[in-house]
Amino acid sequence: MQLFQPYHYAAFDPPKPTQDDPVTVSERIRVRDALLRLDEMLWPAISRAGWDLHHHRQRTHYVSSDHFITLDDGTQVVNFIDGMWLHYGKSPNQLDYIKLQVGGYDYKRRDDDEYYNAFYLHTRIQFYLNNQVFRAWLLLATDKNYYDRSEFLKRLDKSPAAKEELFRLIQPLLDRDFFYEIDGERFNLQSGVTQELLVRFVRRDRPGFYSGIVKEYAPNGPLLDESRIAEEMIKNLGLLYPIYNFMAYRFDARPRAT
């Protein structure tokens, strides 16, 4: 039996992404519940691995919103939901450090006590589904990103060693159906890829783009069966985490073990 059933994917069929009525929200809540079940399967392995990879500090935000969000002043900050995700990223301490040392990111003075250190403005590993596909996704940056992309690209520009390290970290992903994606354009990670070709593609990234490394699964894929999905996604975490650790910019001097 699949963890994510056809009705989970159907929760994002048009015109539902533009709707927020009780029936549509109830469908998204079922998606949220399934993603939290996936978290229960994955989190013990993440904890045992000792990775610097964390939940959002508020359980409410372990999974993306299942309903539209409107600020007190009437500004809509979530008014379209065509997919949902479970995500892991930087620690609360690291995000608090950013606030104390360099200031927060205040997007339209959002009335959210977590927005000053906006977990979702930073590099994350997430498990995502829409009406067509399930993704394991190392998300370097969204259309709004705080430091990670710019600092990562600076390192690639300035340091031959950084280029070599990225290429080294990519090797375990080759021929496993992963691709690097920038603004919807894909670069397949497969045998024959050279460091020059990889870096040339990665450096095309720009502010305002979604970018990262993805592996996709068809909704009826056997590896998404309840008996296999945990093993498969833990394997993906093991492959993606060293690259996440390399890409994610941190404001302290801790060494980054890979």
Predicted features along the sequence, with ranges:
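Long, solvent-exposed, polar/charged low-complexity segments
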Residues: M1-R57, S64-S65, I182-T258
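Residue-identity detector for glutamine
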Residues: Q2-Q5, Q19, Q58, Q76, ...
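Sequence-level detector for tyrosine residue identity
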Residues: Y7-Y9, Y62, Y88, Y97, ...
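Broad hydrophobic/π-residue packing in well-ordered secondary structure
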Residues: D13-D20, T24, R124-Q126, N130-R135, ...
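Compact, glycine/acidic-enriched structural inserts
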Residues: S26-I29, Q132-R200
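Long amphipathic N-terminal alpha/beta scaffold segment
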Residues: H56-M84
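Aromatic- and glycine-enriched beta-alpha-beta binding-site module
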Residues: G74-E165
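A generic structural signal for short, solvent-exposed coil/turn residues
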Residues: V78, F119, P172, R203-D205
